[in-house]
């Protein structure tokens, strides 16, 4: 990660944090009625009977986040072909750690929440926000070795893959087979353009990907799946920045960190304190998310990394201290963007959404704060 990219990640993280803070301020000020317009102003896209009519909040969550998942897909594809994920020996331990970091928070959430009305939120504390995590790593600078940062990114990538699968399997509320079939045809068209006709024009995949996204929304499957699937169909060539996948990943990166994620944070992080009391912190759904993110994530990930290192199954881990591994395990508990996103998919009740937002913010802040403290002040030999 070069110096300019480190600065981008740091600035992007600060903008993301500022957007979330601004949302809370605006939603608890005289401007709250304008903030509410995110859910009352509708925008239509399409012609005649082929129309998608959604409010601004849905366009942000279904549209902008689909672009974000397109970017994630491009990043994962590059890592699989030429990056860390291209070597099986590099991915086994991070993959198992990521799974443990998904399972443990979910189990903690379910152990606290027994009411059938809130069980659907089990996946909320299982996510990791790579944007915030990279911002803190950039802030730590040389205190975190490059290989340790790579380990965090690899775990986060598997976390993203799991999140995509969870959204597709557990948060699809209705299904139109006709629309899904049409979307699949556009995906197949991209594969044919790539593998058979060797088409390298990015615009072709953008157009076909748009139609796949449109059909996916109409099908009832969440649109983020179309973004991720489209990324896997786009041609990638090693050492060629002009290949469609490289070009699109580089082009999207600043838009993701400076615009899409901050807009998502502003739209979804607006906790309204009107009519709620301090006791909301102690409601089962809030506690389940806080403990899931802050305790479950670090417990699941660190236990795997430490045990595998002890058994000498994790060669890369031998160059790190247990404190370093514990510090990055804490950082993986920053669930912010992805946790909020899953929360919005799981519930639409205003009170529950406020509890979710508070739980996500508190759990993420605790994880980020203590992760920073461990890596910055407690780890004595960062090299």
Curated annotation (Swiss-Prot):
Listed Gene3D superfamilies: Na+/H+ antiporter like domain
Cellular localization per UniProt: Cell inner membrane
Molecular function terms, GO-annotated: sodium:proton antiporter activity
InterPro entries in the cross-refs: Na/H_antiporter_dom_sf, NhaA
Keyword list, A-Z: Antiport, Cell inner membrane, Cell membrane, Ion transport, Membrane, Sodium, Sodium transport, Transmembrane, Transmembrane helix, Transport
Membrane topology: Multi-pass membrane protein
Source species, domain of life: Bacteria
Key word DNA-binding present: no
GO biological process: regulation of pH
Family indicated by similarity: Belongs to the NhaA Na(+)/H(+) (TC 2.A.33) antiporter family.
Purpose of the protein: Na(+)/H(+) antiporter that extrudes sodium in exchange for external protons.
The protein's name: Na(+)/H(+) antiporter NhaA
Organism of derivation: Francisella tularensis subsp. tularensis (strain WY96-3418)
Lineage of the organism: Bacteria, Pseudomonadati, Pseudomonadota, Gammaproteobacteria, Thiotrichales
